[in-house]
Amino acid sequence: MTTPPICSYEGSDYQERFWDQADRAYEDRVEAIALRRLLPESGRRLLELGAGAGRNTPRYTGFEQIVLVDYSRTQLEQAQQRLGTGRRYTYVAADIYRLPFAPSAFPAATMIRTLHHMADPQAALRQVRRGLATGGTFVLEFANKRNLKSIARWLLRRQTWSPFDRSPVEFAKLNFDFHPQAVADWLRAADFRLERRLSVSHFRLPLFKRLLPLSALVGLDSLVQWTGELWQLTPSVFVRARAIGADEPAPSGAFWRCPACAGLELHDQLDGLACASCHRVWPLRDGIYDFRESPA
């Protein structure tokens, strides 16, 4: 089965270069506020899609188990170094378009700073919905093409694409901005009900960061995030959606799903997970399950 192209951070120093060494403490803190407002305080199991090096994972303190998924094994290795290898964390290298989880395996999921790398966001959202139980919570962040900066640039004829057109814009290879209404439509089509929207990162421009202290910027952003219910004009938008409709049938307690044959009976063995249906063995190396390439 062919899948859309994948944006891989394999071997990347993204966490260090983009977050640790760059001036993005403001973005990090306002995203943390949005997550607190949208996620349940506690839960049995959380699916973190696009977990990367685990920047947000420590914020999910109320969940008993967190399953970190990323296409990049090296990003997950960094997450392991940050979080450890205890039973609370499960590390999974996987393709978002072929997630290795049984239907209804999770009561909650997040996807932060990840959808903007999806060439087929609708297919990705359908995969998320299949893994969530009916009534489950999904917190999604996406890059908003209809933000004030892009509107101004378009009005001044400094960019060719319209921020009001609902089609995604690919401003760099496998980097997309999305229209808020398009994302809302995709979520509904995937059997999600939108519950809340937050506008985040109002003051991302370097000018604001030079003029105001970090605490003031964070406080101001926190005060106006609620405006996402009225309009979405910030570069980042957070959405809380609820899984609705009927779940796919699955045996009670099923967790894994073979990406190759869709079998739901996978057994632990020393070197990985063996599918009882197609007999493939999905490898487990140094505490990281790898479902990216189909083994022979």
Label each region the model flagged.
Residues 113-117:
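Short catalytic micro-motifs in class I SAM-dependent methyltransferases
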Residues 47, 51-98:
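Class I SAM-dependent methyltransferase SAM/SAH-binding core
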Residues 1-42, 75-78, 139-162, 292-296:
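Conserved class I S-adenosyl-L-methionine
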Residues 161-182:
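Acceptor-substrate binding/catalytic loop of class I
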Residues 110:
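A conserved beta-strand element that flanks and buttresses the S-adenosyl-L-methionine
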Residues 122-137:
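A short glycine-rich, Lys/Arg-flanked "PGG" loop and its adjoining helix->strand segment in the class I
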Residues 160, 185, 196-270:
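A C-terminal cap/extension of S-adenosyl-L-methionine-dependent methyltransferases
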